[in-house]
Amino acid sequence: VDRLPLVDVDSSLSVADRAIVWDLRAPRVVLGLLVGALLAGSGAAYQGVFRNPLADPYLLGIAAGAGLGATIAIVARLQDAIGFIDPVPLAAFAGALLAVAAAGTLSVRRGRTGSPATLILAGVAVANFFTAIQTFIQQQNSETLQQVFAWILGRLSTAGWGEVRLLVPYAAICMAGLLLSVGSLDVLAVGDEEATTLGLRPRTIRRLVLMTAS
């Protein structure tokens, strides 16, 4: 507590105790809170778009797309080729956006966007396809299998303040975007025709929300 600004408390902690609390435990707690908030916001956005209380990132293949992107980056050893930035999160984000685009394209029929149920079915197909590609890549590159699984499953044991500082801008931008779209999602819950009558563009709103949630 005495490390916080404007707080004058004598904690009587040793240097080792301070290092354990501030350098090891605190960043894991903060990172866990940020990740949990982002997952909750993302899930709420998906449920608002699909009007389905069971919607999650797996329905559109977003998780599979992110896993495939990360797998390609790890297997291709892009971390060694690009030293100034970690390419794995960027590749995962690109894979997630690709999954959204693929599911959205498959759900379009005769130039019109399909129903949320059609989009979900397209997402399941995209998820299975991307998962099959990811599994094939893993089988062909067994030496990186452990690293790939460690990234996909996720862990906080190695988290530090560097990871927290890296995540904060993304969390702030994405959560702000999702909060700004709450009103539009409420209108979409009534129906696309009513939303169009009020001057909204349901298709554009869904795309923006899905991209932000991804």
Predicted features, each with a name:
Residues 1-214:
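Alpha-helical transmembrane segments in inner-membrane proteins
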